[in-house]
A protein has these predicted regions:
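Non-catalytic cell-wall polysaccharide-engagement segments
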Residues: 4-120
């Protein structure tokens, strides 16, 4: 529910997940692609599988491809990946964070449209 956790290993991640669940948290993102357990957990055999980098990235790539097919742009696919269809403010924040991270790591640049959209 909005608290970032950076466990050092799988066991710590599993313990953090169990603690969050026992504390009533429902919306918990797992793994390197931050897949939400509440909405996507049924696509995996277990929480351990959600934490497996190969399975996590494979699922995320397939999910993004489905979103891209539905929404026709990668920006909208990325927006929906994180926040779902009824949360425009969260979608905008997420897309802008993704763009900023891509620029910071040398995988893109700010375009005029992106700057305008993200108020940069």
């Amino acid at each position: 529910e909005g608290k970032a956790v950076f466990p050092a290993n799988r066991q710590q991640a599993l313990a953090a997940f169990a603690k969050a669940r026992s504390g009533g948290a429902k919306l918990i993102d797992l793994g390197c692609m931050q897949i939400n357990h509440h909405y996507h957990g049924d696509a995996f055999a277990s929480v351990e599988d959600m934490l497996d980098p190969h399975q996590n990235v494979d699922y995320a790539a397939r999910f993004l491809a489905r979103l891209h097919a539905r929404h026709e742009t990668w920006s909208m696919a990325v927006a929906r990946y994180h926040a779902g269809p009824n949360n425009d403010p969260a979608q905008k924040r997420y897309v802008c964070r993704v763009i900023a991270n891509m620029v910071a790591t040398g995988f893109g640049k700010w375009t005029a449209n992106a700057r305008s959209f993200c108020n940069q």
